[in-house]
Amino acid sequence: MARDYYGLLGVSRGASDAEIKRAYRKLARELHPDVNPDEAAQAKFKEISVAYEVLSDPEKRRIVDLGGDPLEGAAAAGGGFGGFGGLGDVFEAFFGGGFGGGTTSRGPIGRVRPGSDSLLRMRLDLEECATGVTKQVTVDTAVLCDRCHGKGTNGDSAPVPCDTCGGRGEVQTVQRSLLGQVMTSRPCPTCRGVGVVIPDPCHQCMGDGRVRARREISVKIPAGVGDGMRVRLAAQGEVGPGGGPAGDLYVEVHEQPHDVFVREGDDLHCTVSVPMVDAALGATVTVDAILDGVSEITIPPGTQPGSVITLRGHGMPHLRSGTRGDLHVHVEVVVPSRLDARDTELLREFKGRRGRDVPEVRSTHAGGGLFSRLRETFTGR
């Protein structure tokens, strides 16, 4: 995948040129080998120098924003202080150019480059996540030009070295400043950093070697996937410029809420409402489980509100091992809100026989009362 140049500098993709420059200057002061001799800092300094070079160049930044890597396959030429930049890089960030006549050249980026990875978001219901599913999807992507087969040229013509940059892919300018002679490099405006031009381009792809098209792809989603997980389809992304190798296609799963079950990892949770009498005497209820069909659940006599009955191995399959999680059934005891005369009489009789049962006030911090259970649920304490 393409390197995260924005992340290396700690800026967002929408950062302005000034914000990128400030971020690089701050990091350069901290990590430059003349200031910080630590090997890890030196490696980091090299990375941020490359990131700044890419993001400070409009064309290279455009390639990054499209999901590519402008330095992919580029040959590094020249160097500075010990192979990791040098003072010229820092002065370039501070003052807008090289220092003392030195500059770092990366060479042409190459006409044939790897393609970008693509991302497809797919909505799945809980049953599809549990069983796995194969779906046909249509994607708009870059494919190999079927007229020139990726060459980008018309007929038997071929690319030729760029006259403007002499095939180097960049042009340099020298200016005088208070710091002395300042040399700056930028991508060649004629060949856009590639180093070659196509005098007679393909009429279908206009020299790019690829065209936009809609493709139908079969996507196999394995059993046990969860929300936010990505399935990788190798070489199913965009074909690269000049007919370069295709990137990968990533299918990101978005699991839709279920009417009954709530998923927690490989475990499932649901709630059953049990009448007060059944909670006291015991009963059997049925639940239509995701993979097991209708399952019977025994409510033991004397079940209290908030009790949890666990069915081992009745949850979701694990993505890799296939072992099943658990199904946790939360019991909600329903107290009748309206009673007729006969119901009232029977309950009063029952109360009379249970005279020892009286209301009791207890601390909410002990004993597992409702408040305690709620607090534990939401805070873990």
Curated annotation (Swiss-Prot):
Its main location: cytoplasm. Gene3D superfamilies: DnaJ domain, Heat shock protein DnaJ, cysteine-rich domain, Urease metallochaperone UreE, N-terminal domain. Residues 4-68 form the J domain. CDD domains: DnaJ (cd06257), DnaJ_C (cd10747), DnaJ_zf (cd10719). It comes from the Bacteria. The keyword Cytoplasm applies. Pfam families: DnaJ, DnaJ_C, DnaJ_CXXCXGXG. One of its GO terms (biological process) is response to heat. Zn(2+) 2 binds at C162, C165, C188, C191. Keywords: Chaperone, Cytoplasm, DNA replication, Metal-binding, Repeat, Stress response, Zinc, Zinc-finger. SUPFAM superfamilies: Chaperone J-domain, DnaJ/Hsp40 cysteine-rich domain, HSP40/DnaJ peptide-binding domain. Binds 2 Zn(2+) ions per monomer. It is found in: Cytoplasm. GO terms for cellular component: cytoplasm. A zinc finger (CR-type) spans 132-214. One of its GO terms (molecular function) is heat shock protein binding. Transmembrane segments: none annotated. Zn(2+) 1 binds at C145, C148, C202, C205. Coiled coil: none annotated. The J domain is necessary and sufficient to stimulate DnaK ATPase activity. Zinc center 1 plays an important role in the autonomous, DnaK-independent chaperone activity of DnaJ. Zinc center 2 is essential for interaction with DnaK and for DnaJ activity. Homodimer. PANTHER family: CHAPERONE PROTEIN DNAJ, DNAJ HOMOLOG 1, MITOCHONDRIAL-RELATED. Participates actively in the response to hyperosmotic and heat shock by preventing the aggregation of stress-denatured proteins and by disaggregating proteins, also in an autonomous, DnaK-independent fashion. Unfolded proteins bind initially to DnaJ; upon interaction with the DnaJ-bound protein, DnaK hydrolyzes its bound ATP, resulting in the formation of a stable complex. GrpE releases ADP from DnaK; ATP binding to DnaK triggers the release of the substrate protein, thus completing the reaction cycle. Belongs to the DnaJ family. This is Chaperone protein DnaJ 1. The gene is dnaJ1.
